[in-house]
Design a protein with these regions (language model features):
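Short helix-capping/hinge motifs at transmembrane helix termini and TM-loop junctions
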Residues: 17-22, 46, 50-52, 64, ...
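Short cytoplasmic-facing helical segments at TM-TM junctions of multi-pass membrane proteins
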Residues: 72-117, 138, 142
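Generic hydrophobic transmembrane alpha-helix motif, especially the helices
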Residues: 31-68, 75-76
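C-terminal transmembrane helix and the adjacent membrane-cytosol boundary/short C-terminal tail
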Residues: 21, 78, 109, 156-168
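Generic alpha-helical transmembrane segments of integral inner-membrane proteins
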Residues: 4-12, 16, 62, 66, ...
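Glycine-rich helix-loop "coupling/hinge" segments at transmembrane-helix boundaries
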Residues: 48-49, 124-161
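Transmembrane-helix boundary motif in ABC transporter permease subunits
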Residues: 2-31, 48
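Transmembrane alpha-helices
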Residues: 59, 63, 95-129, 156, ...
Length: 168
């Protein structure tokens, strides 16, 4: 769920940033600044706001996924072949039609690249969410194994996490 929401919100944000120079000037510095905040620091806050349930885990995954998708897709949108844009201008294509028919299709490989990165990070976000406040799940199992010095259980949980990430 976090992967899907992060991909949709990241894609829409990238389109909005590419379409509006004002949004680009205002929002892009905040996006870059947000990456300076360690994700681990957000986990307790999200747990306080959203509770110990699934919501905080989804929010953590969404936050981790959002930036790679937004960044990759935005970069691809801005690198659309200038010849294609010039041809569209000559043909009288303007505004959102240029975005919809030329820029977005040309930038889909960049979106896919960001999504591939995000798919690797999604389980990490969920695990971080479980570390803060869960009574079950892989993150909880890892904390339990760590607290009881059970390295075999810790490595087993890490292997399951790695396999799960590769499957995504």
């Amino acid at each position: 769920i976090g992967l899907a929401l992060g991909a949709v919100l990241g894609g829409l944000s990238a389109i909005g940033l590419a379409a509006s120079p004002i949004a680009r000037a205002l929002v892009r510095p905040m996006l870059v600044f947000s990456q300076a905040i360690p994700v681990f620091a957000l986990a307790p806050i999200l747990t306080l706001w959203l509770g110990y349930g699934l919501g905080s885990k989804i929010a953590m995954a969404l936050i981790i996924i959002y930036f790679p998708v937004t960044s990759s897709f935005f970069d691809a949108l801005m690198r659309t072949n200038p010849e294609w844009l010039g041809l569209a201008r000559v043909m009288g294509v303007k505004g959102w039609r240029v975005m919809w028919h030329i820029r977005i299709p040309a930038a889909l490989p960049g979106f896919a690249s960001g999504l591939r990165l995000a798919a690797v990070y999604a389980p990490i976000g969920a695990i971080i969410g479980e570390w803060v406040g869960a009574s079950k799940g892989l993150g909880y199992l890892m904390l339990l194994a760590n607290g009881r010095a059970k390295t075999d259980l810790m490595f087993a949980a890490l292997i399951v996490l790695a396999v799960f990430t590769l499957v995504l």
